[in-house]
Amino acid sequence: MSFHAVARKQPHRGWGILESGGVALVVIVVITVVLGGLYMLWNRKNIALESANVQSIITSTQGLLKGRNGYNYTSGTVMTGLLIQVGGAPKNMMTKGNVTAGTATLWNTWGGQVIVAPVIANGFNHGFSVSYPKVPQDACIAITTRLSAGGSISGISINSTAFSDGNVTVENAGAVCVKDTGRSGINTLTFTVNG
């Protein structure tokens, strides 16, 4: 009788804790990268959208609100309400209040109330300004430099710093656009148009 040594098979024990932890770590990294990319795209969309909104407000104001004596309105509240009433506000912007009465207000993506107001120069209301509050720092830099390159804006103010020629470089904007507090932007942009 002979004895044969039979190799004993080790039972399959499945995944170990180390393998499970490694897979979980890879999944977390992938989710983080995807969410970060989505946040960047969302932010860029807001910047492009609000740049277009400012341009649309300027064009609509020039075409719909300029009268024989320029922009002869008593206040920015009245002028903004009338712009909304005549259909000159971008449709993607939020309005609050009574649109048909001309008392509605206009709000940007970041929750700031946008005001279109007459600007008096040499005793005449031949210009107007568009005030954009609560703008985040990155959007402040991008929007001001983008609209500065367009050439239709006579002056740009970032917070309390005025660029009376309407020319704002990335370096200029980067120096005066203030960082956000938490997740809220605190920059106020004012675009002035003569004519």
Name these PLM-found stretches:
Residues G37, S56, A139-A142:
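Generic detector of isolated residues embedded in canonical secondary-structure elements
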Residues T32, Y39-V78, L82:
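Membrane-proximal N-terminal amphipathic helix
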Residues G67-G195:
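Periplasmic/extracellular, small/polar-rich flexible segments of pilin-like filament-forming proteins
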